[in-house]
Amino acid sequence: MKRKCMILALCLILAACSLQPGSNSSAGVITVSGGGAGEAAESAGETETSKTVDPSQIPSASADIFAMDTYMTVTCYGKRAEEAVAAAQAEIERLDDLLSIGKAESEISRINRDGSGVMSEDTNTMVTEALRLYDTTGGAFDITVYPLMDLWGFTTGKFAVPDAQELSALLAQCGSDKLTVNGDTIMLAEGQGIDLGGIAKGYTSGHLMEIFEEYDLVGAVVSLGGNVQCYRTKTDGSLWRCGIQDPQDPENGSAYLGVVSVADRAVITSGAYERYFVDEATGKTYHHILDPKTGYPAESGLLSVTVVSTDGMLADGLSTSCYVMGLEQSAEYWRNYGADFDLILMDENGEVYVTEPLSGQFTSDYKVHVISQEGIS
């Protein structure tokens, strides 16, 4: 399963072609795997560069990178594309060294080992956002579930359904409200551990957009383990077309529940099909998105959650949060906080829901409901 997700993260086909959403053709579409946008359509016209330069003559560069325990692809277009790709790769590697729980000398591993520590600016920014999301989502996003993820084997690959008493004991120690943060210093409660993996790739892609600005690129796109973020438009001035993997056909990497067209946006998806194991004794499937309130895989009635935002870190954190919260709570959350993001959801009945500002940029062969401030239609 891990290998399949890695392959999907590399599936970037950037030529401009037509596609019927839900079909098996992936031509012209960036695959988003579970991994406000309403103004993106304004960028659909030609860019100043594309008016005067043949798009096929614009220099390009790309790199495939393994970091944060996943495969990543960076593709840049512009005169300084090679420099931008090199700078992006260096930034990815720097943040991987800082944040990876798989590296004993990373900052996060040190904090978990010592129970406290001084945070770098990057870590402090992510922890601050994680605590905000913990508060606004009612605990659906919680960086302190790391010991539970470890207990289930999702951090080691040694999968097992945990003993109920052991799980209950660990669950009692979880809760971001038990963390103490004072300026750049963090202190964990007894038995706690943190993992920023739920927002780290989104934070990273956001940083890459800032790097691309420095190199005055015509356009760029990154896929960090299936988390996609686009810089500006394609070289011909058209929008990037992102195909959201169909959770009802996860084995087929080019089957989409729909296609969303964006510029200068992150498109990040969470789904139960990403990482899971089957218990040999019972035949039951357990996925990796844990409900922080129960310690068990979330059962929210959703199969897939995609968040579209200019803020990669926000999109990353909310894709997980909304999966845990379910349809109704996610819709209400968007109504209260949705100035900076939009949602595309699929429920277990195979019906798709999209927030109103994004509806004009999203196409699907599935039945689509629109989430508005007034309700769901």
How should these model regions be labeled?
Residues 2-377:
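Mature catalytic core of soluble alpha/beta enzymes
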